[in-house]
UniProtKB/Swiss-Prot annotation:
Keywords: Chaperone, Cytoplasm, RNA-binding. GO terms for biological process: post-transcriptional regulation of gene expression. This is RNA chaperone ProQ. GO terms for cellular component: cytosol. Pfam families: ProQ, ProQ_C. Residues 104-186 are annotated as: Disordered. It comes from Edwardsiella ictaluri (strain 93-146). Residues 104-130, 143-156, 163-176 have a biased composition (Basic and acidic residues). RNA chaperone with significant RNA binding, RNA strand exchange and RNA duplexing activities. May regulate ProP activity through an RNA-based, post-transcriptional mechanism. GO terms for molecular function: RNA strand annealing activity; RNA strand-exchange activity. The lineage of its organism: Bacteria, Pseudomonadati, Pseudomonadota, Gammaproteobacteria, Enterobacterales. Residues 131-142 have a biased composition (Basic residues). Belongs to the ProQ family. It is found in: Cytoplasm.
Length: 234
């Protein structure tokens, strides 16, 4: 027989036995109850074969196979045991069936207990994490808003300052314009806009005529009059 690859786990050994003895072992569906003393039959049948399997590996694989839920489900009243070739080797007795039923119930109870323990642990961890959830909502949004408000408050004085700086400039320009007197008739021409000073106030006027005695102007209100150059401004 050809050399078999080395089998490292009990599951691999079971897969090998199912391939070597398909009428006795299986990897899917309900397993058939095994003949009492099947271990000795395996050792005798496989003696001399270069399969690399030890007695310890065979015993561990059989223990795993016969304790699986799939195998225990197959141990029931009326079922027959089989040998390596699938031949019937006697009907299961009630004592063996009851023992298998108890093993199956205990196995299911252990699995359920493990599931319940995981659920409790997950629930406890969830409760411990719950107080931390509100923290993201309390991160620094308020601080950022305060910062924005603070920046706005800083900008307002700047705008006021800029406005206050611009106003004196406008006044100075106006003052300069009002304080420019007409010193010579040569500075004037017909239709030119000038200002006529009357006390502390000045009124806009348009030049109508220029004579040696004075300048005839028309005020914005329609009144025409003759004024001297010292009463005119640009």
């Amino acid at each position: 027989m050809e050399n078999q690859p080395k089998l490292n786990s009990s599951k691999e050994v079971i897969a090998f036995l199912a391939q070597r003895f398909p009428q006795c072992f299986s990897t899917e569906g309900e397993a058939r109850p095994l003949k009492i003393g099947i271990f000795q039959d395996l050792v005798a049948r496989m003696q001399g074969e270069e399969n690399g399997l030890s007695k310890t590996q065979l015993r561990s694989a059989l223990r795993l196979y016969t304790s699986s839920w799939r195998y225990l489900h197959g141990v029931k009243l009326g079922a027959e045991r089989v040998d390596l070739d699938g031949n019937a080797c006697g009907v299961l007795d009630e004592q063996h069936v009851e023992h298998a039923r108890q093993q199956l119930e205990e196995a299911k109870a252990r699995v359920q207990a493990q599931r319940d323990a995981r659920k409790r642990e997950a629930a406890e961890n969830g409760e411990k994490r719950e107080p931390r959830r509100p923290r993201p909502a309390g991160k620094k949004p308020t601080a950022r808003r305060d910062g924005e408000q603070g920046s706005k408050e800083v900008r307002k004085p700047r705008a006021a300052k800029a406005t206050s700086e611009r106003k004196p400039r406008a006044k100075s320009e106006t003052t300069e314009q009002r304080s420019t007197p007409v010193t010579s008739l040569e500075q004037l021409h017909l239709g030119q806009t000038v200002k006529v000073s009357a006390g502390k106030h000045a009124m806009e006027a348009s030049v109508l005529e220029i004579t040696k005695d004075g300048v005839r102007v028309q005020l914005s209100n329609g009144l025409a009059m003759i004024v001297r150059t010292e009463h005119l401004q640009f």
